[in-house]
């Protein structure tokens, strides 16, 4: 294997080939596109005709059936494309296609909250091949998107700053290529678990990076190494804001079957996509849910996910927290730096949104061993019970914990406390909470008090102090 790798690198030192196309320019297999450690094989992208990039337009007026448009004034003007709206391109990844339901579903969620030109970019002609070839074909896709964006600018006076390109997997790097070719003029690029193989550790010219748009954000969901873990996504930061939900490696609800570990990356076909790539696909599912949950994906600046999980990164700072997904561009500090890392937790199935709270309970009553749980009641909803502490319960002691609720309760009105230990105790001990404070991610604290105690498995309601 080492010999093959060495030979490939030696071949990479040989003078490269180049192909040129009228509209899109020239493409070389020279370094860094080929012949480097991360992509040792000399491979050119296929022709534009073979890749066959298509633009499938959905709008608020045609939500169920796309209109295929091209960089042609009459074709665009006869469509439902509106120049007074933002335009969001969605680019699929390896093996996928533009007509796949998740792209149209993402558009439909957008139509619930905004008027928008939603363009699904289909390049299945170039995505359904070996991975190495597909990773080169995205250069053609990126060039086609850049050509389309430039056409909108020159022929229709449509500013690239009104363009948002969303790419999944290889589509993230196609978006980066489009951004590079438009000199960073595109308003926003979102990378949904940007593909790792042939891109992790490569020069910025090759992959998505912060210079590709005015604002670049990324969601990382499958960041384990491709060998031996078959993690398809990058762990490397690629944007101004990089989000690592659930740590960015293993997503709740995704249990990889052992058979998925032996599937070669050049042989994962459509039928095994969900089976083998659950973590990788979570990124676009999170983004889709975020569109209709504008406060449900608050993410926290933290040194690492382990520090976040140790409850050391709450609440949000005075400038607030960014929302992972659709509304990341509302964050005031979005371009204050590059490679800003943020962490959060999600649910294990849709709706994936969660709202984080910190609850502190000061105990009263008798000393026992057991568990204490709290549920929240607010003007927007009620939460289920969450465990705050288990162990020795001492009166006067305060115990704190953070949890991610599947309900945004809004402004807190009351809380309910319960304890249990499943131990038969003839003395029937009583435990209470003299005070409970609840802090939201915006830093607002609600305080509740009670002078009562209760027996095991009996609810105690605390009202505002």
Swiss-Prot record:
UniProt GO molecular function: all-trans-retinyl-palmitate hydrolase, all-trans-retinol forming activity; lipoprotein lipase activity; metal ion binding; triacylglycerol lipase activity
Which residues are Ca(2+)-binding?
A: 204, 207, 209, 212
Which cysteine-cysteine pairs are annotated as disulfide bonds in the entry? 20-26, 107-118, 254-278, 302-313, 316-321, 449-465
One Gene Ontology term from the biological process aspect of the record: hibernation
Where is this protein primarily located? secreted
User: Reaction catalysed by this chain?
Assistant: a triacylglycerol + H2O = a diacylglycerol + a fatty acid + H(+); 1,2,3-tributanoylglycerol + H2O = dibutanoylglycerol + butanoate + H(+); 1,2,3-tri-(9Z-octadecenoyl)-glycerol + H2O = di-(9Z)-octadecenoylglycerol + (9Z)-octadecenoate + H(+); all-trans-retinyl hexadecanoate + H2O = all-trans-retinol + hexadecanoate + H(+)
The record's subcellular locations are: Secreted
Q: Cross-referenced CDD domains, in alphabetical order?
A: Pancreat_lipase_like, PLAT_PL
The residues responsible for catalysis, as annotated, are 169 (nucleophile), 193 (charge relay system), 280 (charge relay system)
Under Gene3D superfamilies, the record lists: alpha/beta hydrolase (3.40.50.1820), PLAT/LH2 domain (2.60.60.20)
Please give the subunit comment from the record.
Forms a 1:1 stoichiometric complex with (pro)colipase/CLPS.
Give the protein name, as stated in the record. Answer: Pancreatic triacylglycerol lipase
Q: State the organism of origin.
A: Ictidomys tridecemlineatus (Thirteen-lined ground squirrel)
The gene is PNLIP
